[in-house]
């Protein structure tokens, strides 16, 4: 019936129309009386609008008549929902109350202090995160470079030393720019110290580059050739990326061992870093034992977030390994293409020298020069494939292993807490047996043990909650850094591909007139 009736013009709305609406207020008397804490409003003209907004759910004609003023009506209605001194809210506050959506009367008259108790921690967390991001911006004001690889010593006692240069404006360092000499074992020793301090409490410690016995043996005993030079450059770049990722971590940057590594001219010799040593074999045994324990521990995961993230990192690890294998194959094919292009250029040059036709001989010689330039382009692109893309994938494969490592430590922490609960239950059963057997001398001992294990259970619960909280924060930071790193590398990689193709076009366009000049 309301849809069939013609809506009157907006200018024809009279106070009588509002009086007809106000006749139905007795249906919502309790709600309106509850919301209105004072009978007199500072603005009398707003009273009809407030009544209409309160009853708009039950009368369609009102919505049709006042369609153009709907925004004003709802704005005034939202100002009335506050129970914290309504007169003061109407006079001083121009912002809408948190309760914006019209709901049931019981929800509308809920005390406002409840909404404050929910929103206050969120605001506090947000401001704390903003402060931390600002602090991280200052913390990241540090540049680290690894350069000048130098062979020290002869024979199997030789090692490579690298210059670590640091530029920073942070007050924690004594100078704004300094450099030190470090060998590869020093980097491994630094990672070992940081991992022993922070890994078991949930921090993701960037892994150091892996040792290569074959590559380093060739550098020690062999002469300088292309393979040795490539190995040294690959290790130098990996060490530089390792330090850059480490100093980006706000907690690790504060560590005294890291500052000593960057500043001290002399470091104590790092021990237990050799691959073929007793400590190295012990590490391998411990890794195998951890793998077995991981299979035997059945953790009842109650947090869906951790279960989802673990599955996500497992899938990401598999896909990264597949992509890394494909990129390595691409690098090999690109190097093979470069070698074949060089052979083609040499053959074209020899053919041009033996050709009697002058124009054809000149064109073949020019073709050989172009192919030599293209050979150089293929080599540069192969290096870009490797150092830009392949090494990034390799780094993140090892970083994901570190992420899975902190998940394993969380599982160990849960297992320790679970074992403490089981032991406490056994102690209480023992106490009950002593009381039944009426052995007062052992009852007191059992009570002391119960108090001891209750403290261990509480500590285990606190440790588990803390490591879970830390891992959540660390995974969030890791995801942001991962997206940022992949974006930067993909853009650089695409730019290198575009530049290579553009250079190829220039080479062939320059050669085209020589080919057309053959008569």
From Swiss-Prot:
Residues that bear Phosphoserine: 97, 117, 119, 185, 277
Region (Interaction with RhoG): 260-519
Disruption phenotype: No visible phenotype. Mice are born at the expected Mendelian ratio and are fertile. Mice lacking both Snx1 and Snx2 die during embryonic development, around 9.5 and 11.5 dpc.
Residue segments, region Disordered: 30-62
Any one Gene Ontology molecular-function term assigned to this protein's record: epidermal growth factor receptor binding
Keyword Membrane: yes
Binding-site list for a 1,2-diacyl-sn-glycero-3-phospho-(1D-myo-inositol-3-phosphate): 183, 185, 211, 235
N6-acetyllysine modifications at: 469
GO biological process, one term: intracellular protein transport
Domain BAR: 299-519
Domain of life: Eukaryota
Protein name (Swiss-Prot/TrEMBL): Sorting nexin-2
